[in-house]
Structure formats: structure tokens, C-alpha cells
Amino acid sequence: MLEKVKKIFRESAEVKLAFVELYAQQIVDVAGIIATALKDGNKVLLFGNGGSAADAQHIAAELVGRFKKERRPLPAIALTTDTSILTALGNDYGFETIFERQVEALCMPGDVAIGITTSGNSENVIRGLKKAHDLGATTIAFTGRNGGKVAQIAHYTFIVPSYETQRIQECHITLGHVLCELVEEMVCERS
């Protein structure tokens, strides 16, 4: 068991190191886009299913609260938290619409929409990002495996080079933390 534990940690680290080699510059670029949007009075909308929903909520909390520095709250909304909205939309319009309809209600031109899906093929995430794109938001996808359908529709896509859901999710939350740290730094230096 001890060797298994070490192997799992090594695999997690290796995936993250491979990921950062592929995406370091894009991470900086996307952080700048998010910081500029927030500085300009726009907001970040985040969504996903299951563990990806938890990541969306976690990232939103870091932006609205604080990550490392005391600063003004930054407007970010996880579209995964209101059970009345989620169940009403799921019941009345179908589960595939639960993010699309919220995006239609809340998204404005200049906002940033982050859709998180380990497979890249979650229909509700795809539809949410498409709607955000149509409404003039910058769209960002966190995904894995081969990128899935979501890789074809987002302005910026981060594809974790793994086919294991847990490794993809571990990398997604690390990416979220890195973006929060960079965005916070950029917003504070620009204030």
C-alpha cells in the first residue's frame, strides 16, 4: 500500500508538470483576460457537474472571498449552487439546459464563462459555453482526455493530458488556484 500511495502522488505530479509545459503561457494570458474583465466591471461565471461543480464553487469562493491578499471581492458566480433553479430548469427544460438558461439570464458581453468537464462532452457544459459565446463572453474550458466537443467551442481550452478522471480533476483545481493567484495579483496591481 505504501508504494501505491507514492505512485498515485507521482502520477498526479507528473500530469501537472506535463500540463504546465503545454499551457504555461496560456495560463498567464487567460489570467490577464479574467483580470481585465473584472477590472472593467464584468464577472466570471463557472459551471460543471459533480467534482467539476465543486471546482466551480471553489474557484468562485476564492474570487469572491480572497485567495492570498486582502482585496475587494471579485464578482464570480458558480451556476451549480441554487438547487431550486437547477431542479426547475432540469425538470421543465431538461438537464442539458441547466447552465445555458442561467447563462442567458446572467451573462453580459465582456464577462468570462468557465466550463469544467473532465470528458469534454458534458452537454450542459457545452450548451452553457455556447450560449456565453453567443452573448459576447470570453469562454474558457477546463477538460481532459482528448478535449472532447467542448474543445471545439471555447475561446481557450485547457486539456489535461490524462484519461484518468481523478488526475484531471486534481490538475483542474491546481489550474484554478494558479489562475486565482495570478488574477488577484493582476487586479491588485492595476487598482
Curated annotation (Swiss-Prot):
One of its GO terms (cellular component) is cytoplasm. Its cofactor is Zn(2+). Keywords: Carbohydrate metabolism, Cytoplasm, Isomerase, Metal-binding, Zinc. InterPro entries: GmhA/DiaA, Phosphoheptose_Isoase, SIS_dom, SIS_dom_sf, SIS_GmhA/DiaA_subfam. GO terms for molecular function: carbohydrate derivative binding; D-sedoheptulose 7-phosphate isomerase activity; zinc ion binding. Disulfide bonds: none annotated. The reaction produces a racemic mixture of D-glycero-alpha-D-manno-heptose 7-phosphate and D-glycero-beta-D-manno-heptose 7-phosphate. This is Phosphoheptose isomerase. It comes from Aquifex aeolicus (strain VF5).
